[in-house]
Amino acid sequence: MPLSKKSAISFIFITLLIDCMGWGLIIPVIADLVAELKHIPVNEASTYGAYLLSAFAIVQFICAPIIGNLSDKYGRRPILLLSLLGFGIDYIIQAVSPTYALLFFGRVVAGVTGASFTTASAYIADVSPDPTSRAKNFGVIGAAFGLGFVLGPALGALLSSWGIRAPFYAAAVLCLVNCVYGYFFLPESLPKENRREFDWKRANPFGSLKFLTHHPEIGGLALSFFLIYLGAQAVQSNWNFFTIYRFNWSEKMVGISLAVVGILIGVVQGGLTRIVVPKLGNNKSIYVGLTLYVIGLVLFAFATEGWMMFAFLIPYCLGGICGPSLQSVISGEVPPNQQGELQGSLTSLMSLTTIIGPLIMNGSFAYFTSNDAPFVFPGVHFLIGAICMLLGAIIAYSVLSKRPAKKMNAAGVPAMEPSVPSPNETV
């Protein structure tokens, strides 16, 4: 008996929740761990933290389209389980690592199998028949990440009192338990009749990016997508390093702040998105969300007290209504049997931002807190992020404002056009 769509969404929510808790556990301690292994101050350690993020992203960039195409051939379930197993192994390596080099190697291992977001996004697309439900269900992914970032950092902050490596062991256990749970309970979302053969041409990481230019709307919105995720790296890659340096935050305070981020993201993407998107439509949700992102980043840049970071998280996290709407518009342009390839391509774009972003954001932070800088400005990377978001908003508007009115329903949500793909269709 086929599972209901609601049950399928619940399965993927729980899977991503536990997976995200594992990553959230280690964020409060990773900055101090890198500083300890390299024997340098935390602002200098931010550069080495960027190398870890970039190493993971480079490998994921190469592997994501391969994983996406494999999920189109074999289904989402086995690929997702492999990803969880890889992350579990990565956390074990980091837990026992005596050197920065081994820590680096662990990130590479995780990059090879780091396809949970790619496969989960394709899974959501499989069980979401129309743009409105697709935007809402992509919001459920955000809610899982948000709740994971509430529980993960909070638990990581508590576990850090037992040692800087304790959160890594806990993260490994969570990922491996999640893998076992998924093996027994996670259903397959892609019917055999909607699968297609693996093709190395489609699995080429650079070739997969050409998929995004198959339709003009996808090409332009993909560039906006890239700039938005690049701007977000100002927060994602350097929050812990910045707050420890600027406000002398402890691991516990970093964990608490990230737990607050998780609560806000959960409220926005798990609840507010379901109310706002149907009323505003995808287009307006994108514009409003990006405006709030820019405001939040500019405020972060000039914060002078630690409490301000908590206050400024409100407009920044409210900007999260943008993401599900933008992804819904993009995914609505392709048929069901290409969703895995599309999500693999989008993940490749995200990986590119995680290759470039940390080097730019952490690098600018490290430089403007060093003796070589003409002046000290720790928040410079937030301004860079705001500029990226602003450019993304301009590009999104230029593309969406040219979309024919017949593609929009009464709610302002793009209506999906009929599409009958050939079984051997290639990009």
Named regions from a protein language model:
Residues 61-100:
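Conserved MFS/SLC helix-loop-helix module at the cytosolic interface between two early adjacent transmembrane helices
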Residues 63-75, 268-282:
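Helix-to-loop junctions at the C-terminal end of transmembrane segments
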Residues 75, 96-101, 113, 248, ...:
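Helix-breaking motifs and short loop linkers at transmembrane-helix boundaries and internal kinks
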Residues 29-46, 237-254:
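Short amphipathic helix-loop junctions that connect adjacent transmembrane helices
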Residues 283-326:
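C-terminal transmembrane helical hairpin of 12-TM major facilitator-type secondary transporters
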Residues 160-173, 363-388:
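A membrane-interface helix-boundary motif in multi-pass transporters
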Residues 1-4, 187-224, 245-246, 413-426:
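Juxtamembrane intracellular "pre-TM" segments in multi-pass secondary transporters
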Residues 106-146:
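Cytoplasmic helix-loop-helix junction between adjacent transmembrane helices
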